[in-house]
Amino acid sequence: IHEIQFGYVERPTHRSRGYDQQRFEVCNHRYTALCDNSHGCAVLNDCKYGVGVEQNSIELTLLRAAASPEMASDQGEHRFRYGFTAWSESFAQAPVVQQAAAFNDPVWLEAGSLQAFSAFSTDAANVVIDTVKRADDESGDLILRLYESKKADTYFHIRSDLPVETLIPCDLLETPVGRAAALKAELHVRPFEVS
């Protein structure tokens, strides 16, 4: 399983067909996982997106150093991190998406104290809030871009410590596409849906 933007793609771990042999390296975003119905493991990365999987091995591409189209590509100093995580449950129940996000955007600690505050969160672990931004129309509205990350039809709620009362569904161009709902309303996303 390889993470892609707003979801994942499953690819075979064998090279028994001709086109599988040519696919010795594929891209991923923050993780690549090997798993079955009861357990699994994943390699997490923060900036290197080439990976090869064969049987039970994951190979990582650190540098390409191709001579074309740029003679000096990948030359110089590189900094990157890899992590490893494992779980003893199905992939659908595993926290790998959250672990990959935390690995890529670690928490920074500062001295002092603050009250607990969460601008936005969901009550479904597989529904990820990817973006919070001001609306392009300069109305002052906030846009939440979220997606379903585990290929599961999901009902969920959004929670906020901000004074938000109403949600208005919109498409990726920020055009309203549904009726306004109260913040406490139950919402729905289809598998891998971006909302």
For each predicted feature, which ranges?
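C-terminal (or distal) subdomains of carbohydrate-active enzymes
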Residues: I1-S195
